[in-house]
Amino acid sequence: MKQGVNPNDHKKVQRIDSRLEVEARLADARRHEAEDLTFREMFEAWLADGVSREDGNAELRRAFERDVLPAIGDKPVRLVDDSDLRAALRRVGRDRGAGRTAQRMLSELRQLYRWSLSRKPWRTLVADGSPAELVEARQVVNDDYEDGIRDRVLSDAEIRELHEIQVRLRSTYESLPAGHRYGGVRPMKRENELAIWIMLATLCRAGETMKAEWKDVDLQKAEWFLPAANTKTKVPMLVFLSPFALRQFEELHLLTGHTPWCFPARPSGRVREGAQPPDRHVHEKSASKQVGDRQVRFMSREGSLDHRKHDDSLVLANGERGVWTLHDLRRTGGTLMQAMGVPLDVIDRCQNHKLPGPKVRRHYLHHDYANEKRAAWNRLGQHLATILSAAATSKQVARKGRSRGARTTTATGQVLAGAE
């Protein structure tokens, strides 16, 4: 009071000053904490709120956890620069030779940073802009990488050879005594072998095929309905099954018809008697991986993967035409239709492509091309049946040759099973 200051007011000022100091310290701590947020934390935030894919982002997470997060996951976002991203992607595109994967991941990194630039607290940590934009696609691949759409088409000889390989591997494996099968070359699951011919005969994508349910397959009418949710274009499709394609589905039904799914997921662990059938389909890439695992000469792997095949049993034409994939079957079937004179607009509809042209045309023109598509699928099926019947003929010749001690080969030069 001697200084003319009310003690109560003085205490209030001190309390206010103390509170302001605490708030300032807390704000400073929060600022420092935000500044130290890691790339992994930004990635997790993006997965939760910035991107949504059909598989629940599982493939996206798997790719980043394998190739990006081990290198920069624990690094503060503000310290991650283009050289960090470039180095991580080069390990994929150059060291591993997976150029397409590296370029896809670069695109995903750009998406991640575009999302972060407009959201707190990330935008303050990337105030200088997206480092992913400073990485060029050509910088993460080898010099001989050919950037473009695959154009691999299987020849008639390769289609025939593929069938012969399947038959030979299965026959050889099943003829082995039970105790010796572990060391033998195990064929693909029969379901996936059938999937190959279904995809080739119908032009359907691998993911669409793996999701098929028996309720959508009418074996009596020879029809397969693909709901919009299962197609890439989100447009439903009715496939008219050729006799060739129908035979594949009929055999498949003997294997999996007791489940809702044409390609059911394998139950984990030991299956108990009376257990419920699988309640989901196999992973969309299950068959694709099985095909790739059997062409390892084209894969940049240092060794075999756990519980995965690691051989060259499905390499075609001695590998001279490179790796083949399941998506190549779709291209092959379309090309065969084209060679047989099927109009391109009918092929587009058989492949369920999103059709070009003005919306008004699609709005007013409603012919469903059912007869044209049925005829196209039937012609393709007849051609495939002819190819495989030639394979069967070559087997008969091989058996006669073996009886005379002759050495018999296929049209592609491959020695048939049992030939001397």
Question: Which role does the model predict for each range below?
Answer:
Residues 31-32, 164-174, 221, 255-259, ...:
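C-terminal secondary-structure termini that scaffold catalytic or DNA-interacting sites
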Residues 164, 168-192, 202, 239, ...:
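Short, basic (Lys/Arg/His-rich) helix/loop patches that form interaction surfaces
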Residues 3-26, 80, 114-146:
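Short, charged hinge/linker segments at domain and secondary-structure junctions
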Residues 23-96, 112-114, 139-143, 293:
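Basic/aromatic-enriched alpha-helical hairpins
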Residues 35, 39, 43, 56, ...:
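Hydrophobic (often cysteine-bearing) scaffold residues that line and stabilize catalytic clefts
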Residues 92-110, 118, 125-206, 210, ...:
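Basic, Lys/Arg- and aromatic-enriched nucleic-acid-binding interface segment
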Residues 211-217, 338-339, 348-355, 364-365:
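A short, basic/aromatic helix-end/turn motif that makes direct DNA contacts
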